Amino acid sequence: MSRVLVIGCGGVASVAIQKCCQADTVFTELCIASRTKEKCDALARKLEGKTKTVITTAKVDADDVNQLIQLINSYKPDLVMNIALPYQDLTIMDACLACGVNYMDTANYEPEDTDDPKWRAIYEKRCKEAGFSAYFDYSWQWAYRKKFEEAGLTALLGCGFDPGVTQAYCAYALKHEFDQIDTIDILDCNGGDHGYAFATNFNPEINLREVSAPGSYWENGHWVEIPPMAIKREYDFDQVGDKDMYLLHHEEIESLAQTIPGVKRIRFFMT
């Protein structure tokens, strides 16, 4: 049995919440919290009679650490699932540390204000040292490792599909299928069609930031950076068909470069 606080009630969060409610023997109690409580209430009503999970809702501004601490201390969850925006990763991690609660998210931190002088100075130093210039990277959250270890807490980062399932596939392949993995290509395909000319795969602002950033990939121990969407490939996806896809920077490249010994190249493509 577990009590989980989910922060966020957008497209990704609503899917995750419904999946949790399907496993109601595991997720016995769930609190859905968002800046817009009405969205949380609407989802809770939609799930009435479809799950044994006890669902409550709350209003919270995830940019405000004090509000987060108050909510976490009030609800007393075993785990906080951060399925809000990546801008709020650090405030939610700080709140979890203050309250002694485990943490999980789906995407790594990036700042909302990329012109902030303090952040900019650290970012420009990282660009020179690491060799890629995307606004999002794991360095900010990996810096919390020691704090969580010393507190006896777990922080699981990037637990969506990509990042998330993609790394699990790679780890499984290395453990059970291969003695050595030299190259990894991750192909992210959206096969849906709602009749419109354009739609993002997730939060529009984050998705547009991602595709407009310089692309980068890992090769022979270092980053190679290219102009945005400069490398295009076509791939015949099973049950979907031919799709154009473009090389992007993506956070799981960072973690896979550290966790797959001897890997020579890692790339990420999105349709």
Feature-to-residue mapping (PLM):
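C-terminal catalytic/substrate-binding lobe primarily of soluble NAD(P)-dependent oxidoreductases
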Residues: 175-271
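Rossmann-fold cofactor-recognition segment
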Residues: 49-64
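Glycine-rich Rossmann-fold phosphate-binding loop(s) that bind the pyrophosphate
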Residues: 9-10
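N-terminal Rossmann-fold NAD(P) dinucleotide-binding loop
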Residues: 13-14
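Helix N-cap at the beta1-alpha1 junction of Rossmann-like dinucleotide-binding domains, i.e.
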Residues: 36-39
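Rossmann-fold NAD(P)-binding glycine/threonine-rich loop
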Residues: 107-153
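Conserved Rossmann-fold cofactor-binding substructure of NAD(P)-dependent oxidoreductases
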Residues: 61-77, 88
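N-terminal Rossmann-like NAD(P) cofactor-binding module of classical short-chain dehydrogenase/reductase
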Residues: 72, 78-82, 103-105
